[in-house]
Amino acid sequence: MRIAYGVMGYGRGHAMRARAVLPSLMEEHEITVFAGGDAYAVLSKEFPTVEIPVIGYQYNTAGDQSVTKTIAANAGRVADLLGRGQAARQLEQDFRDRGIELLISDSDTWTHKTAQRLGIPRISFDHVGIIAYCKPHFPAELWAAGMRDAAGYRAFMGEPERILISSFYPAQPRKAGTELVGPILREEVLAATPVNGEHLLVYLNKGEHQYNSQLDRTLRLLDCPVRIYGTGFLGISDNLDFRAPSNQRFLDDLASARAVISTAGNVLAGEATYLGKPILAVPEEAFEQRLNASIIERLGIGMQARLKHLHPADVDHFLGQLDQYRYNMTELRQDGRVQARQTLARFIDELRPATRPTRQRAPQQKRRQALSRAVPDSA
């Protein structure tokens, strides 16, 4: 089949999940990836990828997510998306030119809306679906926010024909056609040999905004080396080693870390659990991250803290519980990749059209340009 694979471009976790399943899908199907932002930077190096706009959070000077800046920065894109502006119409044409028969989307609104408008069946494959398409499992302090975000996500994305959710923790689907699998682990993670080294690994998904003076002071006061990814800084300062993005080097540092301090993304939580690395989660203010951090603490595989108010005493308390966290992780290690591939294959077969649409081929030069162009940004 000719399949579009849409990937949300905010952060790298969506791209890592896609990267783990794309090679097997491409053995059986003709795949075009549609992604923007961080995901485009990762995936375009390995797969045929069309760049699309990104709707993402914006930050204020204090490093917090800013509602006003987020609305202002995304207003033009959202208007284009919902009102079938230039970028939305171009994306529809891209789908027609490639004869797209099916969409798999990892939290990407652009490809979801395009497939809906063109009557193309959809498979949602992400983590955030656990909020929208599973029965509520939110702690009391997050209940109202969870119900709000679940309703909002369903209103924006609709109800895809099939839903596959990858998560480091279990939940109960709301309806048939929804299935859960474990974390989607990369080959590099499965091949890694974990050892308990001396260093702590710090990862911030938007560290250029999140790395603050309080966190810097706390990390410098620790009596151990700290390897830091995601800030944009480079070089060694005291016990801090600021490192550039690198898949293999990051995984080597993860496998040999004593423990992890990170924002509360699902992908890293699954990888850290598989490798037996306790997690001190410092979530963004977004509900999904706050829920993940709460679950990490509830499962006993780490603890949560406020990023802007992290103190050495918090880290010391966390480090004092590492043995218990590691023990709890042994029963939660899982790799959902094989099950995800099997489920995707079954979903694709169930949604396969009885007759294929006639493909509207674009001129070869136009196709080459489409693979590298950025969809015009109306913001």
Map each language-model feature to its residues.
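Donor-nucleotide binding loops and adjacent catalytic segments primarily
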Residues: 184-259
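A nucleotide-sugar donor-handling region in carbohydrate enzymes
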Residues: 134, 139-209, 230-232
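A donor-sugar binding/catalytic signature common to diverse glycosyltransferases
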Residues: 102-107, 247, 252-292
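Catalytic binding pocket for nucleotide-activated donors in carbohydrate/polymer assembly enzymes
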Residues: 268-269, 273-325
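Conserved nucleotide-sugar phosphate-binding/catalytic loop shared by glycosyltransferases and other
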Residues: 8-9, 32-82
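Conserved nucleotide-sugar donor-binding subdomain of glycosyltransferases
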Residues: 68-102, 109-110
